[in-house]
Amino acid sequence: MSEAALPPRVQRFLETHIDSIEKLEVLLLLRNQPARIWTAAAVAQELRIMEASAQGRVEDLCARGLVACEGGAPPPYRFAPAASEDSQAVTELAATYASRRVSVISFIFSRPTDRLRSFANAFRLKKD
């Protein structure tokens, strides 16, 4: 399946908010249990990733308004998108990821290559 197989809303959401599979997995984990309060350590344990990486992912999702961050030590997090459009997009993304996982993964991995290529092209010497 190609990127075209992804719904436009899912593509826009991925382009705007998701830059790695790990961040996607963190978001979907929190979404699957919206009433649960999570810590970075609990996320790391559940997904079997490094705690520092989990901390960075949940903080980024919090800054993007997809996860609620509540004061405390360690800080607790829960799935609570600030915008209803984001909530709907995450629901659609979860369904798409469940049915077309390879297409979603391909879409996420194809984007950094394009950004790196355009950055590298900025340093190409051009003939005048």
Where do the protein language model's features map onto the residues?
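Short helix-capping/hinge SLiMs at alpha-helix to coil transitions
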Residues: 16-20, 31-36
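Pre-recognition alpha-helix immediately N-terminal to the DNA-recognition helix
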Residues: 24-29, 103
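Short amphipathic alpha-helical interaction segments
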Residues: 48-63
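Short alpha-helical segments that sit at the start of domains
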Residues: 1-25
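A short, conserved structural fragment
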Residues: 62-74
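Short, cationic-aromatic polyanion-contact patches
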Residues: 17-20, 71-93
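A short acidic, leucine-rich amphipathic alpha-helix
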Residues: 26, 39-46
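Exposed, interaction-prone assembly regions rather than primary DNA-binding/catalytic cores
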Residues: 99-128
